[in-house]
Amino acid sequence: CVLCYRAQSVDRILYLIGSFEFKGIEDFEKSFEKSDFGEWLKKHKKFKVECLRLGSHDFKSVDIEKRLVNFINKKYKNAKFGMKLYEIIFFVHIINNNCYVGVDFAGFELNKRAYKIFLHPNSLRATISYALAKESGFQKDEVLLDPFSRDGIIPIEAALYANDFPVNYYKKDRFAFLMLNLGVDYEKLFKGIDRKIIKKSKSGIY
């Protein structure tokens, strides 16, 4: 939950429940047996499935989504699939011939920022901009000068880092983990993190 709220260098935050290698699409249903869906479906009956693929395959992401939905519906009779009404998101991440299955804690792409309203044609991804700021060796009490700032993504990401400002401060109500029964007081969690925001940073960012 904390990573979803604060992390600047990630696209997704998943709780891993299974992983396997495969040769073809026919391997998936048997391999899904290795993933612990049951523990999560005890508390969350309505589910959604998403899939993201990297690499060349003879199937589409939607094919894997359908197979996982069918697998869960067959094995867990009380579970119900829903595109809009759901309590938990099972996310399938495929990289070449490796598959990772997890619970999506964010529910949206964490590389997208609330401050990016109008995009520059050559705008960098926020995650890359943060990585560049860190790669430069920038520290929280130092000065950062970006003479080629364009739409200012690198300085903005550096400022968020320098002030310990949660990158998803304005998306508190959008997280998928808010629907999960984790026994966490989310309001208290957010307030605890927000209290650590540095009001007046010692760094200079231009």
Regions flagged by a language model, labelled:
Residues 78-91, 144-148:
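Short, surface-exposed recognition loops or helix-turn segments adjacent to catalytic cores
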Residues 60-61, 112-115, 157:
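A short secondary-structure junction signal
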Residues 1-85:
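Non-catalytic nucleic-acid substrate-recognition regions in nucleic-acid-modifying enzymes
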Residues 55, 98, 107, 153, ...:
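Short loop/turn segments at secondary-structure transitions that flank enzyme active sites
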Residues 59, 63, 67, 83-87, ...:
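Residues forming well-ordered secondary-structure scaffolds
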